[in-house]
Design a protein with these regions (language model features):
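Gram-negative outer-membrane beta-barrel transporters
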Residues: 492-495, 590-592, 611-696, 786
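Short, acidic, small-residue-rich periplasmic hinge/interaction motif at the N-terminus
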Residues: 29-36, 41-46, 72-78, 88-133, ...
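Short, acidic Ser/Thr/Gly-rich low-complexity loop/linker segments typical of extracellular
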Residues: 49-59
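Periplasmic N-terminal accessory/gating domains of Gram-negative outer-membrane beta-barrel systems
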Residues: 79, 86-93, 115-210, 221, ...
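Face-selective signature of the C-terminal outer-membrane beta-barrel domain
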Residues: 292-308, 336-510, 585-588, 636
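Membrane-embedded beta-barrel scaffold of Gram-negative outer-membrane proteins
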Residues: 362-366, 524-526, 561-619, 628, ...
């Protein structure tokens, strides 16, 4: 199927190139206003799928298939030029062009914006979201190409930043903090994350050293803002994995954003080693309504309904693992089924008051209710087939066993928050403050059991803290949080800026008063193409239900806040190279954690050792470089190095690797146009994450002597925009109703690499333990259409 579709796509591309012999040869030189040659300028003939680029001397040659045509010259940072040419007969012509600088476009690739200078954040290019090939379809897929983020699971919206856990990341949508489900144990159960990419106007991400205005987590912050449209429009995204529709409606004093998304990735999940009937259905509905009562006062309402139903009737499994000379195959026959339900409803109301042009006051109130139901009743007969070099030749021995996995878990969580915050700008200062109250209520009914038998003999699993034989417990917990912050950003000189902030917090669980000072110093030399940053601060994460619930379901109500001391130094440098404007960013960091709650990680499920306490440290460096090698298509490359270790107090083992100790991470997102057909584009995503430490649940609880292999993945997409600016002969019907009509062909996991996400730990009758790899998704073809309807005033 995949080979046939790719062949058809290649034939289609080839067919579009069929044409008559060239009639006109155009040559010339492209220079700037001072007469200097401009290399790498794109020269295209609109409507003919012909394009080229200028050489190092600014010279180009191109052929036209007709005698009447339009030439278009484009180069990043310069105004585009179009020239209409009409020839009476075939031949050769000389056409020299002078491009003028576009200062507005140059501003987009400089780093002198003061807001970015005073914030240790990276602005995410949201125009990449629709084009980036992603099997999950969630916004968070783009985060895994960000500096400091470790990739290890393409199905999950969860992410680890600089050695931190999934629970250490802050997410804000329109200043409302968003939480994630608690019970999810496998990424295939995850549905649609909260963020609707079609409604976005901006997104910023910080991998550490963020401002005092943001909340009390240890690792990162993602700050997302939804659009404030000035005209009405709609977007339809339809593909093999789901459907999404969003609408933006603008009236005189208000606007409405509406988005509905549906996802069903059964075609992806069905190709895993676990064969069976997969029925995943995920739906998300969001509404944002903003009304301007007056020029000074407005009200903004956000509503959300998110539902996920995951059902699996497993049938069989066949997994081969081991070395080339000592292979083992696990064969499994299943009975039973799994059915999980996740539902979140809620919203927020924000009142915004602007009494003066330099003063903004916001009052934000939110409430979310999440119901999670996990029903798992699966049994499995399994057989190990072992052999040496003759594996598969019949020289095998078999051992039969059975394991059963049961869970009936119900969790209801309710979160209410109210926050008052203000920003006021003076001549050289921006002063901010905020007050926040939050209450979280949890009602948890936890029932789990797991057992293994070999040839009718029950394996004693009483020493397994990780799986647990039987858990049956009911918990109720309410936690109240009180926080406040002040922050001042001001210019010490024309080249130096300082930001000082202080957070204070109290919670009625640990009953601690916490103070977290933070500092950011930025220096911009007079040349205006560099920024040096230094940040230092204290980050404290108060206990919540996830961290106080031990692996056996018991609650440690005496747990104290986790605390990290973070220091980093970085450089942003913008320069011209490779025919475009490039931005290089680097940052080195050190994070010492004197109070840390250890945990074990299995897929996306974290099991905290809530009764224990640890200390740890993380250090590393992030590097990235990016630019528009082709106009309007941003490409970037990044590499990160890191070491993360922890020492659990009183265990006598000293420092061991943290579960997130991924030493090397690399990512690349590269985009290009086909040289002779610029309306066709290619989008390539590459991810690499080195091995992760893991230990057997039946061994010492802090063991890290085993590893999950390195994560390696390549996804590629091909797109064709039928209304691209490079095409002058646009389909009349499409041009009448749509501003963009783009078709995508995507290949997920292009190299079909088996990436391991976790292990199934089993023993045979000889008490030999096996770590059976649980593989992630294999190669998969996807087709989709993204339609953007024309704006209506």
């Amino acid at each position: 199927m995949l080979r046939t579709c790719l062949l058809l796509f290649a034939v289609f591309l080839g067919f579009t190139q069929l044409s008559a012999q060239p009639l006109v040869k155009i040559s010339g030189k492209v220079t700037n206003e001072t007469g200097h040659a401009l290399p790498q300028v794109t020269v295209a003939i609109l409507g003919q799928s012909q394009s080229t680029i200028t050489d190092a001397l600014g010279v180009y040659h191109i052929y036209s298939k007709s005698k009447s045509f339009t030439l278009k010259y484009t180069f990043l940072g310069y105004n585009p030029v179009q020239i209409n040419i009409k020839q009476d007969k075939a031949g050769r012509i000389i056409q020299d062009v002078v491009l003028s600088i576009n200062p507005n476009e140059l501003e987009q690739v400089t780093i002198t914006n003061k807001q970015n200078q005073l914030s240790n954040t990276v602005t995410i290019n949201i125009s990449d979201l629709a084009s980036m090939p992603s099997v999950s379809g969630n916004f968070e897929a783009i985060l895994k190409t960000m500096p400091g983020v470790s990739p290890n699971n393409e199905l999950s919206a969860q992410y680890s930043v600089r050695g931190g856990s999934f629970d250490e990341n802050l997410i804000y949508v329109n200043d409302v903090e968003i939480s994630r489900p608690v019970l999810v144990r496998n990424a295939q159960q995850e549905g649609l994350s909260f963020i609707n990419s079609d409604l976005l106007s901006s997104a910023k991400f910080s991998a550490g050293g963020f401002e005092a205005r943001y909340g009390d987590k240890l690792s990162s912050v993602l700050d997302v803002k939804y659009d404030k449209p000035d005209s009405s429009t709609a977007i339809l995204n339809a593909g093999l994995l789901g459907l999404a529709f969003s609408s933006k409606i603008v009236t005189t004093n208000s606007y409405l954003l509406a988005g509905i998304r549906y996802k069903n990735n059964s075609g992806v999940l069905g190709k895993q080693d676990n064969k069976g009937v997969y029925t995943p259905n995920f739906t998300d509905v969001q509404l944002v309504y903003n009304y301007n009562l007056s020029p000074e006062f407005s009200v903004n309402v956000l509503g959300n309904f998110n539902s996920g139903v995951f059902r699996l009737i497993p049938e069989s499994r066949e997994t081969e693992f081991g070395t080339l000379n000592s292979k083992v195959r696990l064969d499994v026959d299943y009975d039973g089924e799994e059915k999980d339900n996740y539902q979140t409803t809620g919203g927020a109301v924000a009142l915004k008051f602007i009494p003066r042009s330099n003063y903004v006051l916001k009052w934000i109130n939110s409430y979310f209710n999440t119901d999670e139901k996990e029903h798992l009743d699966v049994g499995a007969w399994y057989r190990f087939n072992k052999a040496g070099a003759g594996f598969g030749s019949g020289n095998t021995e078999s051992r039969i066993g059975r394991y059963t996995n049961y869970a009936m878990n119900l969790l209801t969580s309710k979160t209410f928050s109210s926050e008052l915050k203000s920003d006021q700008t003076f001549s050289s200062h921006t002063f901010s403050w905020g007050l926040r109250y939050e209450r979280k209520d949890y009602n948890d009914d936890l029932n789990e059991s797991y057992k293994i038998e070999q040839e009718g003999v029950l394996v004693d699993n009483k020493d397994s803290f990780y799986q647990g034989n039987n858990i049956s417990i009911q918990n109720k917990l309410a936690i109240q949080y009180y926080t406040a912050y002040v922050q001042d950003s001001y210019g010490l000189s024309a080249t130096t800026n300082l930001q000082l902030g202080l957070r204070g917090s109290y919670n009625d669980l640990s009953k601690e008063f916490l103070l977290s000072p933070r500092l950011l110093l930025a220096y911009r030399p007079a040349r205006n193409n560099k920024i040096f940053r230094f940040t230092t601060g204290v980050y404290q994460q108060a206990p919540d239900y996830r961290s106080v619930r031990d692996f056996n379901g018991m609650l440690n109500l005496n747990q104290k806040a986790q605390r990290a001391y973070n220091t980093s130094a970085g450089l942003d440098y913008a320069f011209d190279g490779l025919g475009t404007r490039l931005k290089f960013s680097s940052e080195v960091y050190f994070k010492y954690l004197d109070r840390l709650i250890p945990y074990m990680m299995d897929n996306v499920r974290l099991k905290y050792l809530a009764a224990d306490e640890a200390k740890g440290y993380t250090y590393g460096a992030d590097f990235s470089v990016g630019g528009e090698f082709v106009k309007d298509l941003l490409s970037y490359f990044r590499v990160s190095f890191m070491s993360a270790k922890q020492d659990v107090k009183n265990d006598g083992l000293g420092y061991l690797k943290r579960p997130t100790d991924q030493r090397v991470n690399f990512s690349a997102y590269f985009q290009d146009r086909l040289l002779n057909s610029p309306t066709y584009k290619v989008h390539l995503s590459l991810l690499y994450g080195s091995q992760l430490p893991v230990g057997s649940p039946l061994a010492a609880r802090y063991s890290d002597d085993f590893h999950i292999p390195a994560y390696k993945r390549a996804d590629i997409g091909f797109s064709k925009d039928f209304l691209d600016d490079f095409s002058i002969k646009k389909p009349v019907f499409l041009d009448k109703y749509f501003s963009s009509f783009t078709a995508y062909v995507e290949v997920f996991n292009l190299l079909n690499i088996n990436n391991t996400v976790s292990y199934l730990w089993l023993k045979d009758a000889d008490n030999v333990q096996y770590a059976v790899p649980n593989y992630l998704t294999s190669r998969r073809l996807n087709l989709k259409l993204v339609l953007k309807f024309k704006n209506s005033k």
